Amino acid sequence: MKWREIAITTRQENADAMAEIFEAVGAMGMVIEDPQLIASYIESNVWDLHDVEIPDVPEGMIRVKTYLAIDNTLEERLAALQEELSARERSEKWPAHAWTMTDLHEDDWAHAWKAFFKPEKVGRRVVIRPTWEEYVPKEDDLVISIDPGMAFGTGTHPTTVMCIRALEDYVHAEAHVLDVGTGSGVLSIAAALLGAKRVLAVDNDPVAVATAQENVILNQVDEIVEVRRNDLLSGLSEQADILVANIIADVIIRLAPQAAALLAPEGIMIASGIIQNRLDDVVAAMTEKGFSIEELISHGEWAAIVARRAGVSAEG
């Protein structure tokens, strides 16, 4: 199959909205090229300068890429994408978007991003290692070997890093964990390696489900982690001690009532993928459903929330 890669330069704070737009037109996945994030990795010696190319975009901007199958619906979806972006430019005063488009074979798409993915210690103990890179573990390291394929999530994006660090703080030996929108499965694998008794990982994307399952088996946690195709929390009844969702603000807001119902009393919800200017909206939605905010975590333009479900009252 051939794919049309669409690369668009936009403001950093528009990343959340761009994900919604791409999903609405049926695009497959999103890649964010953030020069500030890449530069911070280089400065911290996570990557060598020669390993990556820093995107040439104006300050405060990022490049986002998505992929549309080249088929008989392509022109219709490109027109819908253009219409949605034009509407945002008019109503929300977004700057005009510069587009580039490139045609790719699936093999090109599946391998082009690998130059950007290097081993990285993302928490106090958790290390993410791509399967094609060597890494010598240090004492107490928990190494996740991962091949994210075409699914969302390598484990090194700030939104995922904040989730992993929160999991390090809250996972305990008897914990049942629910990972909503699992992508590559990295958060579920981290929870299992940190000692969770059971993890249920769900995603509505069949490519993500297949990739997550492969990564779970690769890391030998398939007796702990079950990967299932599911539309968010729809139809789930299994109670969890910890629910982790690294998605986007509007989806987290929609999840709040179901999350409150599925979490055990005093259960923990870790929500990430929230752009800073939507943080107050998510906090309000969660507190309205009875959550108390334990922690607010920030990393650049991104935020994460750790919240606790209310316990059972003495009368209940």
UniProtKB/Swiss-Prot annotation:
It holds the Pfam family PrmA. GO terms for cellular component: cytoplasm. GO terms for molecular function: protein-lysine N-methyltransferase activity. Transmembrane segments: none annotated. Keywords: Cytoplasm, Methyltransferase, S-adenosyl-L-methionine, Transferase. Its EC number is 2.1.1.-. It is found in: Cytoplasm. It is an enzyme of class 2 (transferase). GO terms for biological process: methylation. InterPro entries: Ribosomal_L11_MeTrfase_PrmA, Ribosomal_PrmA_MeTrfase, SAM-dependent_MTases_sf. Its main location: cytoplasm. It catalyses: L-lysyl-[protein] + 3 S-adenosyl-L-methionine = N(6),N(6),N(6)-trimethyl-L-lysyl-[protein] + 3 S-adenosyl-L-homocysteine + 3 H(+). It comes from the Bacteria. S-adenosyl-L-methionine binds at residues 160, 181, 203, 246. Belongs to the methyltransferase superfamily. PrmA family. Methylates ribosomal protein L11. This is Ribosomal protein L11 methyltransferase. The gene is prmA.
